[in-house]
Regions:
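Beta-strand-rich modules
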Residues: 329-350
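Structural motif
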Residues: 19-27, 79-88
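Conserved aromatic anchor
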Residues: 289-301
Length: 359
């Protein structure tokens, strides 16, 4: 329950903990004991697309600057159906008292609570994904756990080396010189036998950069790390210009050297994508809760953000789609009119938002 401007916002986790559409809804009342009314904008926290999916079982709090945040559990469900990760998303109340959580670019680098930013959508740094579907070389591969899984933007697939020994490595080719601002290493467990806590529950590694794939320079040194950070995010102090990155294993707690994703963020030289053309939304005549969303693919885009909401100026929810030109959407309410828009994403930035479509 969150109290804001005299109203009480009762939040709850909807069914579907084990699915990517797991979300939180909200009811609103003038009294803490009700009666409560279903908020027309629902779910209030929703993330069915992108690298990290799902945001339910959540809680809302304020930071020291008064900004609201929604911390929720995100679907993984790979080793076990209720396997989760934790996501943190900026949250706000609009002038009409509508509570919403911004999950657009929620799995990209964003400005944290140290930055006094009132509009949740302004927390995105603008650093684009540089690693999507880029070619990867590895020191070894265990069974079916292919190196292509390292750059597919899917947290539920992973690559594993044959061992967890020092010297196992990953090399990624970004295709051209890129301006790198941050790196995220998403470790995973493969053939791990560790139970409970241990003194060596941490990852140690080095990252090297290169212009030509032959001559390497040390870029990140975590050889003495002693913190348990399985989704390690490294924000570089200065922009790193490089084409190749190489990750060298030094220590894993148990099992094989294994990652679900090697993510790189920053900028590429070039133009931002053009606005998306032929954006269409068709609600199912038999079941208005469903809609088929389609568009013409942009030749220079790797992904798209679909925004929707209950008014043209309230497009608060976002669905990220990579490498596709359609989305089968099954998350609408009966009896509610919705508005949709889309933007294209490439390594140089974001396109202008499309015209808003009413359905």
């Amino acid at each position: 329950m969150t109290k804001h401007n005299g109203k009480y916002y009762f939040q709850y986790g909807a069914p579907g903990t084990e699915f990517k559409v797991y979300a939180d809804g909200v009811y609103v009342s003038d009294s803490p004991l009700g009666p409560f009314t279903y908020q027309q904008h629902n779910p209030m926290s929703y993330k069915p697309g992108g690298f990290v999916q799902g945001v339910g079982h959540s809680g809302t709090f304020q930071d020291l600057k008064g900004n609201y945040w929604h911390v929720g559990t995100c679907m993984l469900s790979l080793k076990y159906k209720f396997e989760r990760r934790i996501g943190l998303y900026p949250t706000a109340f609009d002038p009409d008292g509508v509570m919403y959580s911004t999950t657009a670019f929620g799995d990209y680098p964003c400005w944290n609570a140290d930055y006094d930013i009132k509009n949740p959508s302004d927390r995105f740094t603008g650093w684009m994904l540089l690693s999507y579907e880029k070619p990867v070389k590895v020191s070894s591969t265990d069974s079916i756990y292919s190196s292509s899984n390292l750059t597919d933007e899917n947290m539920r697939t992973y690559w594993a080396a044959k061992t967890g020994e020092p010297g196992e490595w990953i090399e990624i080719d970004l295709g051209a010189m890129k301006h790198i601002k941050a790196i995220q290493l998403n470790y995973y467990d493969h053939k791990s036998v560790q139970h409970n806590r241990a003194n060596d529950l941490y990852y140690q590694y080095r990252i090297y950069s290169s212009d030509n794939g032959t001559d390497w320079t040390l870029a990140v040194d975590k050889s003495d790390n002693d913190k348990d950070v399985p989704h390690d995010y490294i924000e570089l102090g200065e922009t790193l210009d490089a084409r190749y990155l190489k990750l060298e294993n030094i220590h894993v707690p148990s099992g094989n050297f294994c990652l679900s994703e090697f993510r790189v963020f920053g900028f590429a030289d070039g133009e931002k994508p053009l606005p998306v053309r032929n954006f269409k939304v068709a609600r199912d005549k038999q079941d208005k809760r469903n809609a088929m969303i389609s568009w013409n693919p942009s030749s220079d885009a790797y992904g798209y953000n679909i925004y929707y909401g209950i008014a043209p100026e309230k497009l608060y929810n976002c669905i990220t789609v990579n490498g596709a030109d359609h989305y089968d959407f099954r998350g609408l309410d009966l009896g509610t009119t919705y508005y949709f828009a889309i933007e294209a994403l490439n390594e140089s930035g974001r396109s202008a938002l499309s015209k808003v479509v009413k359905q």
